[in-house]
Design a protein with these regions (language model features):
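ATP-dependent adenylation/pyrophosphate-handling site
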Residues: 231-251
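A phosphate-binding catalytic loop at a beta-strand-loop-alpha-helix junction
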Residues: 214-228
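Long compositionally biased, domain-poor regions of proteins
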Residues: 127-137
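A structural signal for isolated positions on well-ordered beta-strands in alpha/beta enzyme cores
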Residues: 107, 213, 242-244
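Gly/Ser/Thr-rich loops at beta-strand to alpha-helix junctions
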Residues: 112-119, 219-223
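Active-site-facing substrate-recognition patch
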Residues: 3-107, 123, 137-208, 251
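Active-site signature of alpha/beta-hydrolase-fold catalytic machinery across serine-
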Residues: 124, 227-231
């Protein structure tokens, strides 16, 4: 089953007759992706290409991830209780497949987000699996102002630097220099790996972990997950890391 977008009513629902945007049945899930730094990322629901509209017709809202946007309340999209129940039914069958694969984590670390969806997903994984402890706030986003400061030290092409600066300044225009920067504000995905959008946050005094499971709502370029894993390895050199996301990549 996939997702159907009712553009007129800004409503996203689960549809059993196709796999547009995502495969949400236990069959075919979870999926695995390996990022550039070797990080293994498992996704509960794989993503597919949405149904293409006719030439000249505006694409449906949601940037090819309409259900994610609906769950986060973005683009004025919404969903139904029935659709959430359908997804949860599949999730409860898919998660045990990942747990049974053998990676037993000490910590679950949700990545910071402007929405509470990632935190809720992390809590659900923790309670459903009964494995590890969930630590919120271990990773935080850097400010847009800090992104601009870091940009000056990067040894990259002048054209790339200019494009990133333009994207960050556009973000600041609609927010503020102190606002936590959102990596998706850089529309050219090839430029995102130049930016480290995260830094270490705060954790109470705890025993260093042997294994950590990073949690995010979706993986696209994987920039944030790569940065988070690099931060962890710098702090805990021997730690083993994997990542789990709600929705996968369309790659």
């Amino acid at each position: 089953m996939g997702f159907t977008v009712d553009v007129a009513n800004r409503l996203v629902t689960v549809d059993h007759s196709h796999n547009n945007y995502s495969v949400t049945t236990p069959a075919g899930n979870p999926t695995v992706l390996t990022l550039s730094n070797g990080l293994k990322v498992t996704s509960i629901f794989s993503r597919t290409k949405g149904k293409k509209g006719k030439r000249g017709v505006k694409a449906p809202p949601g940037d090819n991830s309409p259900m994610l946007y609906a769950l986060k309340g973005m683009h004025q999209l919404q969903t139904t209780r029935r659709a959430v129940m359908d997804l949860n039914l599949s999730y409860r069958q898919i998660l045990p497949v990942y747990v049974a694969a053998g990676f037993q984590w000490d910590w679950l670390l949700p990545l910071p987000s402007s929405s509470n969806l990632t935190a809720l997903f992390a809590n659900r994984v923790c309670s459903r699996s009964g494995v590890g402890v969930c630590h919120h706030g271990a990773m935080v986003k850097i400010s847009a102002q800090q992104v601009l400061k870091n940009l000056e030290a990067l040894q990259i092409k002048a054209t790339d630097r200019s494009a990133i600066r333009e994207a960050v300044n556009r973000f600041i225009k609609y927010n503020s220099p102190q606002t936590a920067f959102q990596i998706k504000a850089i529309s050219r995905t090839s430029l995102r790996p130049y930016i480290n959008p995260l830094m270490w946050g705060h954790l109470p005094a705890v025993v260093p972990p042997r294994r950590v499971l990073l949690i995010d709502d979706m993986v696209t370029t994987g920039t944030s997950l790569v940065c988070a894993s690099d931060i962890l390895r710098h702090r805990y050199p021997t730690v083993q890391i994997e990542a789990l996301t709600l929705f996968g990549s369309t790659k």
